[in-house]
Design a protein with these regions (language model features):
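Alpha/beta-hydrolase active-site loop signature
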Residues: 16, 45-50, 115, 291, ...
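Active-site signature of alpha/beta-hydrolase-fold catalytic machinery across serine-
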Residues: 97-101, 373-377
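The alpha/beta-hydrolase serine catalytic core
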Residues: 104-230, 380-518, 524
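Short, surface-exposed "cap/lid" segments of acyl-processing enzymes
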Residues: 2-44, 277-320
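N-terminal cap/lid segment of alpha/beta-hydrolase-fold proteins
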Residues: 1-7, 231-282, 510
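Catalytic nucleophile-loop/oxyanion-hole region of alpha/beta-hydrolase
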Residues: 49-80, 323-355
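Short beta-strand immediately N-terminal to the catalytic nucleophile in serine-hydrolase-like folds
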Residues: 84-87, 111, 361-363, 387
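Gly/Ala-rich beta-loop-alpha elbow adjacent to hydrolase catalytic centers
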Residues: 86-95, 362-371
Length: 526
């Protein structure tokens, strides 16, 4: 929010895991818009991200109502100023619908729009690929899954319970000509859908290519997309600069959660407090992975923190610097900085808890390295819960990277057996650079990082509170990490237990796997 705004932009996210990939780009764009005098509002749909509710219970018809309500709030906060909408992927189609339905949208920016039917098809394809990795074959064909959805059944698509109603709604989500000025980016991915917005003669399609950041592990350079978006919106006619009507701002807390920030005001750590229901029995600090945010993969952190809160835990979920809604850029992130952020968060949790309350730390993926280092420095941490921990320091064998590369090769080999893969290769629709990165850049660490990890392991030898390791059966790193941590804990007398969730991947992309993970985790923590 700029001190004096000349316009306002509503940023409409995509669905499912694409929301996680788009979030860093939206945060970067929102900050650039604010620097240009344009206020930006980013929200989560009901049942998504940090919002209330479960995805399974969402009413798809409400998505457009939520978009309209968010725009109404922006209009009330910035009376008389022009309003813009920016949507990504399926969110781009919602942005276009919003612009068509309301007369107060001055312009629209659409990033890589995808029709609802194509998005549904991609969800199903991704589910089948993950099924093949987990079970060696797809247990259901796409046509069988589609038939179940058309019958109104709910299908678990990689941790998201997709209802028949949501699937039917997606089939009707199509591009439409725009009457308002529009900037439509295909990025080199789906030019046909992008061109479908040009029927009204008001759309511009710039030739800007970028990787599929909504579906990419890790962080990619999207500065060109953000800069082009801001430059185009900035060049449009704006209103006279006014100070936002902050009294109409949304509250920073609800009955069950609080949004807050602490640390350096220039680079604040953005956090969510999930408030305990009833007397506080303890606290829980959640530490996300390298490319994630405080919601966790398919909202696992959001959901598990709320489960703990209902059982009397005060939970704190921070975004590390350079991630999520915290300050800094993606290039600022490092394991060392993540550990500093975690210490700041732990201190804040201690101050808020009743004296002597036990604190548990929950980490996933790279967040487990941070959790272990934090516990080594704070041995009073009562319990350490590590989901899919990577091997650290000298515990990591040279075979770790080879196992992951081999698993990736098997995955791509399966894809090469499909006719549609060759059609995409011929059409230039496969990001070969991203494939190469996945195959040859597996988990490389600097010598300095390895030394820091060994120093943390040396200090952690004295930790004497319970540790729980949880691994997925199809995670290629699980066998080595599981054995290495078991040897380490046995050698140094650290009380520990290990759970293996059969067939699960690194991020437990299944409602059944997630349920089993939560049950084991609750048994350990309570």
């Amino acid at each position: 929010m700029p001190a004096a705004a000349t316009g306002g932009a509503l940023l409409i996210p995509p669905f499912a895991e694409e929301r996680k990939g788009v979030l860093p780009v939206y945060v970067q764009t929102a900050r650039s818009l604010a620097d240009a005098g344009i206020a930006a509002l980013l929200f989560d749909f009901y049942g998504c991200g940090d919002s209330d509710g479960d995805f399974a219970s969402t009413d798809p018809a409400a998505f457009e109502i939520e978009c309209s309500a968010a725009l109404e709030w922006l209009a009330a906060t910035l009376p008389g100023l022009p309003l813009f909408v920016n949507g990504a992927r399926a969110g781009a189609l919602l942005a276009a619908r919003l612009a068509a339905a309301r007369g107060d949208v001055a312009a629209a920016v659409l990033w890589s729009p995808v029709s609802g039917a194509d998005f549904a098809r991609q969800l199903l394809q991704r589910h089948m690929v993950n099924d093949m990795v987990a079970y060696g074959k797809a247990r259901e064909s796409r046509s069988a899954l589609e038939a179940r959805l058309r019958q109104g059944q709910t299908v678990d698509l990689d941790g998201y319970p997709v209802s028949g109603a949501f699937y039917a709604w997606l089939q009707e989500l199509r591009p439409l000509p725009l009457a308002a000025p529009a900037l439509v980016f295909s990025g080199g991915h789906d030019a046909k859908t992008a061109e479908a917005f040009c029927g009204g003669g008001h759309a511009t399609l710039p030739d800007l290519r970028y990787p599929p950041f909504w579906n990419t592990v890790g962080h990619v350079d999207t500065r060109g997309l953000a800069a082009a978006t801001v430059a185009w919106l900035r060049a449009l006619p704006h209103g006279r600069a006014v100070a936002p009507c902050l009294p109409t701002a949304l509250p920073a807390s609800t009955q069950t959660a609080e949004l807050a920030s602490f640390g350096d005001p220039e680079e604040p750590i953005s956090v969510i407090w999930d408030l305990a229901d009833g007397p506080v029995r303890g606290g829980a600090l959640f530490l996300h992975g390298w490319s994630g945010d405080r919601t966790g993969p398919h909202r696992m952190f959001t959901r598990f923190a709320r489960l703990l809160a209902r059982n009397g835990f005060l939970c704190l979920r921070p975004d590390f610097i350079g991630r999520g809604l915290s300050g800094g850029g993606s290039g600022d992130a490092s394991i060392a900085l993540m550990t500093e952020n975690a210490q700041t968060a732990l201190d804040a949790l201690r101050r808020r808890l009743p004296t002597g309350s036990p604190i548990a730390v929950v980490g996933i993926c790279s967040g487990c390295k941070v959790a272990l280092t934090l516990a080594a420095r704070n041995p009073e941490i009562a319990r350490l819960l590590l989901w899919s921990p990577e091997s650290m320091g000298s515990l990591r064998s040279p075979a770790t990277g080879l196992r992951k590369t081999f698993a990736a090769l098997k995955n791509y080999a399966r894809k090469l057996l499909r006719p549609e893969t060759w059609r995409k290769l011929a059409a230039g629709k496969v990001q070969t650079g991203m494939v190469a990165k996945a195959l040859v850049k597996q988990e490389k660490r600097s010598a300095a990082e390895a030394i820091r990890e060994d120093a943390a392991l040396k200090l952690f030898r004295g930790f004497r509170n319970p540790v729980c390791f949880v691994f997925g059966g199809s995670d290629p790193d699980a066998p080595g990490s599981r054995a290495a941590y078991a040897r380490y804990c046995h050698a140094h007398g650290i009380p520990h237990e290990t759970h293996l969730i059969a067939h699960a991947g690194h991020s437990y992309y299944s409602e059944r796997w997630t349920r089993e993970l939560f049950e084991a985790s609750m048994a350990f923590l309570t």
